[in-house]
Amino acid sequence: MILQRTLKQAISATGVGLHSGERVKLTLLPAPPDTGIVFRRTDLPEPVDVKVEPSLVNDTRLSSTLVTDTGVRVGTIEHLMSAFAGFGIDNLVVEVTAAEIPIMDGSAAPFLYLLQTAGVVDQPKKKRFIRVKQSVMVEDRGVWVRLDPHDGFKITLSIEFNHPAFNRAPQTVEVDFARHSYMDEISRARTFGFMHEVEYMRNHGLGRGGSLDNAIVIDDEYVLNPEGLRFPDEFVRHKILDAIGDLYIVGHPLIAAFSGHKSGHAMNNRLLRKLLETPEAWEFASFDDPLDAPSSFHQLPPQE
């Protein structure tokens, strides 16, 4: 059967918060079956646990940020959540010493390295998937996202930037995880921003940790990073990386096709909320025989 997964052992890393510019320590701890993903703020007078769920995503201006009813925040979670989804991790406690997850290199690859180093272990409880049975869509002024029934996991995304750096590359990408590898084709795509946005954020006390080491920065015409892009279409691949992380906030892998145009964290979260508010549109699924699961999920990294 397809079982739930956690890490074999704890592992830590230190990085910089994208917005605060402060050093942040991150520690990933194994957790029992059915725990889900829980963030723990250890920098507060009393540690506070924040379980990942769509209803707690209450700030999506610059990232997916969890905010509790007492105002405790955990921000910039989407790249780490994307790595958990790509590695098939169900249960984990994430200790963090600040209000945001470190940005690392702006992609999910450093987080995947942490997971690989710690190793994964199956747990004696069936993994629960969410199977989409009916299409669900959210639309707002030309921006849209939708989930459709699909026997696997597939993402089709398009972006639209009238800018020379974007016009040189495809702005639409489809990735069917029955045939494509998250690790090789998505995890290394970095976040991106425009020089004028960076200046605006810094003037407003944000983006203090941002640099060419953890983001693709674009001026009026060119990519400023001396090494260039990791993929010709790295921009839209990063949007796929983000979407995978945003969707995993639902707490289970989705058996569905996700598509979107100019989508971002806010729309991805609205889509999850609409799905959960439409009980006839989805069901839980588990698999006694791994071969009965869609082939998209046969490629999860093996246990070491």
From Swiss-Prot:
GO terms of biological process kind: lipid A biosynthetic process
Pathway membership: Glycolipid biosynthesis; lipid IV(A) biosynthesis; lipid IV(A) from (3R)-3-hydroxytetradecanoyl-[acyl-carrier-protein] and UDP-N-acetyl-alpha-D-glucosamine: step 2/6
Positions of the catalytic residues: H265 (proton donor)
Pfam families (alphabetical): LpxC
GO cellular component: membrane
GO molecular function, one term: UDP-3-O-acyl-N-acetylglucosamine deacetylase activity
Amino-acid positions noted as binding Zn(2+) in the UniProt annotation, renumbered to this chain: H79, H238, D242
Cofactor annotation: Zn(2+)
Keyword entries, A-Z: Hydrolase, Lipid A biosynthesis, Lipid biosynthesis, Lipid metabolism, Metal-binding, Zinc
EC number(s) recorded for this UniProt protein: 3.5.1.108
Catalytic activity: a UDP-3-O-[(3R)-3-hydroxyacyl]-N-acetyl-alpha-D-glucosamine + H2O = a UDP-3-O-[(3R)-3-hydroxyacyl]-alpha-D-glucosamine + acetate
Role, per record: Catalyzes the hydrolysis of UDP-3-O-myristoyl-N-acetylglucosamine to form UDP-3-O-myristoylglucosamine and acetate, the committed step in lipid A biosynthesis.
PANTHER family: UDP-3-O-ACYL-N-ACETYLGLUCOSAMINE DEACETYLASE 1, MITOCHONDRIAL-RELATED
Protein family according to the UniProt entry: Belongs to the LpxC family.
Name this protein carries in UniProt: UDP-3-O-acyl-N-acetylglucosamine deacetylase
